[in-house]
A protein has these predicted regions:
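Conserved helicase motor
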Residues: 10-16, 309-322, 476-479, 494-514, ...
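Conserved Walker A/P-loop ATP-binding site and its immediately adjacent core
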Residues: 278-302, 311-314, 410, 478
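Conserved strand-helix element at the start of the C-terminal RecA-like helicase core
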Residues: 280-291, 464-489, 494-496
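Inter-Walker segment of RecA-like/P-loop motor cores
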Residues: 303-352
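Interdomain hinge/linker at the junction between the two RecA-like core domains of SF2 helicases
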Residues: 407-467
């Protein structure tokens, strides 16, 4: 039996017995407040998260909303008045401003009024509230704060009295928004869809996973031949392990191709995370072809239940295990996994978005490690906002950032823009993990360059390529790749790699090439590729 004076937040009818299951607004707001406080506590602002949770759905206590939710579910209501507006989010924003004042509430109001629609432009928030205050609907007198003392912890918090750097303001705004949005969705799911709720979380911690990585790397070392390259890889690994307990901050790992950068950077990140009790590792990569390769390796080490792929070419339905498949689908919403492998686009679009679906995951980046692989591929036209964002996440949200590449770009000091007015100051301190005395570029110089500056025809280049049995030829354009491929003889296997191929075909072909190169019964393997193989695709050719 639903009482007329019950303030309903969510309800559904039990399929088995027809009984109405009610979540009161008080229950929902307290549940959201507890979760949002836990999320915001990761960057030292639990009282801010709690305030957001306690206020975000106060508008559901309006008569208009209570009539609406009952009518939508076919329930009787004694209130016969007609209400034109049953929206609710703006009410919490108005109460936040009244309760906490203009100076303190500016980092709460937008999050509350936007938690269903997406963040508004900061300059529009005042006008939105003004319009609502002038409307008749807000004058019902059916909303109030039962216990204003609940918010005293927030009002008295040192941070509420401090000033946020303007360039960091919008990142803090999004981070608080993320805490509220995810807490709201999760608490609703806990009541409305308990089966999905139970599938979330329960992943291993990074401390649980570290021994698996160490055992995997030890096995590789035990089976490796005593060569100069393998000794250098071991040296890089030991240096990463030795420096991993350093304080949180910005780090770079500059290791030439073949130096074991992928596993050594992961070892540094995991040991750094464990030493600082950090939550997860997020690896951002510019190309999906490298992501598939990296994610495959990580799943081999840690199991697919602990590694989340999140990019446009990954379909969770391809995961064979049903439990892992459903967990991965849910985790793409909020990145609640110990290890995430994603694209630069997915990462930075989320960091600068106003959408609820994009921002929801952001709070799970707090107190985590961000590994930017092939960092030289960051778009120069967006470098300034990217640097500002990374500084904000490091300074305010306890993130450590590791830049990995064979050739580090300039990210510190004065960075030149497209014109003198666009010049900006880069990251102040980036600590390189590999000391100069290692001289890795000299030690790993295994390529002999022969430069011929005379022009060559397609036929001449094809003839030159055909002189070798196992050879990779990299050209500038897809047209060049096609022309050369068509001119190669058919005496053996010839393949091409370019963005003309769909991602699945590209991934399949790269795997085929790796297999063929190990197959002694297949002496001729010639590949024509565009520049997509130049950044992180793990293929070794003699020529």
């Amino acid at each position: 039996m639903i009482e007329e004076n019950q303030l309903i937040s969510h309800l559904y009818q039990n399929r088995d017995n027809g009984q109405w299951m009610i979540q009161t607004n008080d229950e929902h707001q307290k549940g959201v407040a507890d979760m949002a406080a836990s999320f915001a506590g990761q960057f030292g602002l639990p009282s801010w998260g709690r305030a957001l949770g306690l206020l975000h759905d106060k508008g559901k206590e309006r008569a208009a909303f209570q009539q609406y939710i009952r009518k939508m579910n076919g329930l009787p209501t004694s209130d016969k008045k007609r209400y034109d507006d049953h929206t609710h989010a703006f009410v919490g924003g108005i109460l936040a401003k009244e309760l906490m004042g203009k100076d303190v509430s500016h980092l709460l109001v937008n999050q509350i009024i936007s938690h269903h629609t997406g963040l508004h432009d900061f300059g529009d928030v005042g006008n939105i509230l003004k319009e609502r205050l002038l409307s008749k609907e807000i004058n019902e007198g059916d909303i109030s704060i039962n216990n204003p003392l609940l918010f005293q912890e927030f009002i008295d918090s040192p941070f509420s009295k401090s000033k946020v750097e303007w360039k960091h303001f919008h990142h803090l705004s999004r981070m608080l928004f993320s805490c509220l949005v995810d807490a709201d969705r999760l608490d609703t799911e806990r009541f409305m869809d308990v089966e999905s709720w139970r599938k979330r979380g329960n992943s291993a911690t990074l401390a649980d996973l570290l021994p698996q990585l160490e055992a995997y790397m030890q096995k590789l070392q035990s089976n490796a031949a005593d060569t100069k390259v393998n000794r250098i890889r071991q040296q890089v690994k030991e240096q990463c392990s030795r420096t991993s307990s350093s304080e949180k901050g910005f780090y770079s790992l500059t290791v030439p191709t073949g130096g074991g950068k992928t596993l050594s950077s992961l070892l540094w990140a995991m040991k750094h995370a464990v030493s600082h009790s950090m939550n997860r590792i997020i690896i951002a990569i510019p190309y999906t072809s490298i992501i598939v390769q990296t994610a495959g390796l990580l799943k081999e080490i840690f199991g697919e239940e602990n590694v989340l792929e999140h990019h446009s070419n990954f379909d969770p339905d391809d995961i064979k295990d049903e439990e892992n498949r459903e967990k991965a689908k849910l985790a793409t919403e909020n990145w609640d996994y110990p290890i995430i492998v994603t694209t630069n686009v997915q990462l930075f679009e989320s960091m600068f978005s106003n959408k609820t679906s994009d921002c929801r995951k952001l709070h799970n980046m707090a107190n985590s490690i961000l590994v930017l692989d092939e960092v030289q591929m960051l778009p120069t036209g967006f470098l300034r906002p990217i640097v500002d964002a990374l500084e904000a996440y490091q300074e305010m949200f306890g993130v450590s950032v590791l830049f990995t590449t064979a050739s580090q770009p300039v990210l510190s000091g004065l960075i030149e823009g497209t014109n003198p007015k666009a010049d900006f100051k880069g990251i102040e301190h980036i600590k390189e993990i590999i000391p100069e005395e290692f001289a890795l570029h000299d030690q790993l110089r295994r390529v002999k360059l022969s430069i011929d500056d005379t022009g060559k025809t397609y036929d001449e280049i094809a003839a030159k390529v055909s002189e070798y049995n196992k050879v990779l030829c990299i050209v500038n354009t897809r047209k060049d790749a096609k022309e050369l491929y068509d001119r190669l003889p058919n005496d053996g296997v010839k393949l091409h790699l370019s963005r003309m191929m769909c991602p699945a075909h590209l991934h399949e072909t790269i795997g085929k090439i790796k297999t063929l190169l190990k197959d002694e019964s297949q002496p001729i393997v010639r590949v024509i590729a565009t520049q997509l193989v130049e950044a992180g695709v793990d293929i070794d050719f003699p020529v």
